[in-house]
Amino acid sequence: MTLRNASLTAVAALTVALAGGAVAQDASTAPGTTAPAGSSYHTNEAAPAAADTAPAAEAADEPAAEEAEAGEAEVTEEPAATETPAEEPAADEPAATEEPDAEAEPAAEEAQATTEEAPAEEPAAEEPAAEEPAEEPAADAPAEEAAAEEAPAEPEAAAEEPAAEEPEATEEEAPAEEAAAEEAPAEEVVEDEAAADHGDAAAQEAGDSHAAAHIEDISFSFEGPFGKFDQHQLQRGLQVYTEVCSACHGLRYVPLRTLADEGGPQLPEDQVRAYAANFDITDPETEEDRPRVPTDHFPTVSGEGMGPDLSLMAKARAGFHGPYGTGLSQLFNGIGGPEYIHAVLTGYDGEEKEEAGAVLYHNAAFAGNWIQMAAPLSDDQVTYEDGTPATVDQMATDVAAFLMWTAEPKMMDRKQVGFVSVIFLIVLAALLYLTNKKLWQPIKHPRKPE
């Protein structure tokens, strides 16, 4: 491949040199004197010019041939190279063709310089230049073919190089895109893991704060198998409920007449009627509002923003001392509902936040630690008739005891009946044992005959 390119380049350089010599010879003639196209003047002058340019072309061909031989020597040193030029790598063709072309370019530039120096007014000089290429069609044809072959070869090589580079670029871009695509899910996974860890940490903190909220065990008078309600405490609790809690919470399951029952607040009958008259109720027969009577129940408070009914709240929160197990803890310590109510009423620390358009208040005893009910109690909010200091702790204890009574209004009677029943069963068991022993005594230990 290298030898062919070198020979073609030499032929092209020779042709260009001949054309340049002819043009220079025509330019040396005097202006106004022209020779016939077929005269011996042109033939005699063209021969020395050709003879002069031939050594120059040969001198130019010698370095090209030497370089071509050097290139062949380098190619033959490679083990993969063979004698056929077609098997050589396509990447070597541009390098081999460019070296001779670089040497042929100075000759072409010299020829162009001579043509530019020639006057444009000499038509006779142009005619021999046009005739001489026609005289050597055999030499021009290989040169043109070589130029045609070289011209497509270079674009093809140039096209092959970008084409070879483009797959590499696409291959490089593809891993880069894949890496970016992998990094994006990886970042999402990391963010999801971070968000999950943050959520777990928040949930753990919430659980820890809720678990850490200790509900203190208060020694109420009604706890234990022999406990009973404190009448004065129930009356104070009724006062706290009426003045503070009844605005948002009802006692729909508690009849007003039970306020006079033994074991409860034990209010006089006239006070019970006066207390009931403070609440109105719609008469189902006349469909008109009337004052309540002792046979009616406490009002039911319902509507948006109202709290739950407190009739059975002390038993609904009975999880402090059980409820699973043998029941001995509940027997001696109670069910834990009043302690929970007391803890909620005294568990506010003043912290609050706004969420979803609602204001929430931090409460250490409430599930989740945030409650929508504001702190209902404050010191000296209620004035007790018996002169007891109205502290938050005292009012919370009193109303918790009162709500325990509303959930268990017959607790003292139940305990009394239970105590009597247990004593009776103990006595009955003793009598049955003695009776059984008396009946089986003659059979187990018969008398011996005398």
Curated annotation (Swiss-Prot):
Transmembrane region(s): 421-435
Keywords tagged on the record: Cell membrane, Electron transport, Heme, Iron, Membrane, Metal-binding, Respiratory chain, Signal, Transmembrane, Transmembrane helix, Transport
Cellular compartments per GO CC: plasma membrane
One Gene Ontology molecular-function label: metal ion binding
Segment forming the signal sequence: 1-21
Location of the protein in the cell: Cell membrane
Membrane topology, from the record: Single-pass membrane protein
Stretches the record annotates as Disordered: 24-210, 284-305
Acidic residues bias: start-end ranges: 59-77, 85-108, 118-194
Positions with biased composition (Low complexity): 24-58
Post-translational modification: Binds 1 heme c group covalently per subunit.
Keyword Metal-binding: yes
Major location (coarse): membrane
The protein's role, per its UniProt record: Component of the ubiquinol-cytochrome c reductase complex (complex III or cytochrome b-c1 complex), which is a respiratory chain that generates an electrochemical potential coupled to ATP synthesis. c1 functions as an electron donor to cytochrome c.
Quaternary organization: The main subunits of complex b-c1 are: cytochrome b, cytochrome c1 and the Rieske protein.
Protein name: Cytochrome c1
Gene coding for it: petC
